[in-house]
Amino acid sequence: MIEILIGIYILENIYMLYKQYKRPLGIFSPVYIVAFMSLGQMLPQLTTIYFLPQIYDRSIMYNLLFTMITCNWAFYLGSKKEYTSLPYKVLDIREKYIIVLIVLFAPCSYLFDKIVSAGHAGIETGADGVIAFQFQALGYISLILSLVYLRNHKLTPLLSGCLLLSTYPILHYAFGIYGSRLSTFIVALLYAYLFTIKYPQKYNIIRKVFTIFFTIGCIGSLSISEVRTNMGDETSGGIGNINYIENMKNAFSGGSYNYLAGMDLGNAALGIDHCYKENEFNWGLFVWNGFVFNYVPKRLVGQDVKDGLIVPFKSDKYIQYLTNGITCTTGYYDAFSSFAWLGFFVFYALARLFAWLKSRGKYSTFYMMMYFFMLSNVAVAITHGLQLVFAKVEFLILLFTILFFLLYRKKIMLKNL
């Protein structure tokens, strides 16, 4: 039975991938990314669980596979149903301020790079990781705003400079400091969109190149530990001396399993089983707890106040034990720990949000910026946790609550169609 469920999961994601690939601009769909990550990142971990029954009892795979299959399918159905009604008004950024935001936020990528580089070198900066990544987020917003703005405007020297200023630090972090798969993916995704809007007649070539890049990235990601170890180490031959194909084979057979660190989907399987046996669910409050962790500053309110705002659950300690600050629990655990077998509603709701933003993004720079800001993180929503996407929504809400005077309600006229 387990083998049949694994087969269903594989076929489901192949179908989703094929359907999105054939759709116009389908590579910029969250379903395309989720299906790709499911096959390229989750499937090797799933087969590892299957081939290591001495670590992961086969019985825990039923709830895990049910959750994986239903969540992905719910996400597909939620994205498939488009909003067809024309909105009367949409929230948008006043056009005269778009360039201001692009120029203002572009240097934030550089600040992020300097903070992280200093930390990597062991230099004390006084800024923690959460603060550093908020600077990175602002740099991403500058990059995304530039691309969305270029839908209807020409590329100018100022925009070119902002694109370079916001992009280079991201690539430096990806290839020079940490070996970040997400940063590499985001740059590839956003620049694929840039080339698409500027050269729409070349979209067939762009989607093929992007798909090949994504495939190579998934293969390389299965060797991420060696990549990060060998990066910049000339004595080991660098990343070119890694046997990627052999590592890929080991990833599917359980041969690359780290007995000390564990793995993300394995944590999800054990965490789901724990919630099931303890009959304890958080009813979606993981989103609130994540908000408190990310955006309630302990330096202002104190650690005790911050801890008091978090809604505690018994499973939290078990998850901390499993992850040990090294690995994650995946978005599938977030779904099941919220509503048990009905956890797929979380994925469906997220897909509907994407569909809603996309429908309004046709008429609004603000909504399209939000769409791509979330889309750029949907890959890690599957592999790491859904909070990483919800946090982007929270960040934009907080940011534009402060910058509310830049927004206005734009009436949709026939000329906008």
Show which residues each predicted segment covers.
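Membrane-interfacial loop-to-transmembrane alpha-helix junctions, especially the N-terminal start
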Residues: 22-37, 91-100, 154-164, 358-371, ...
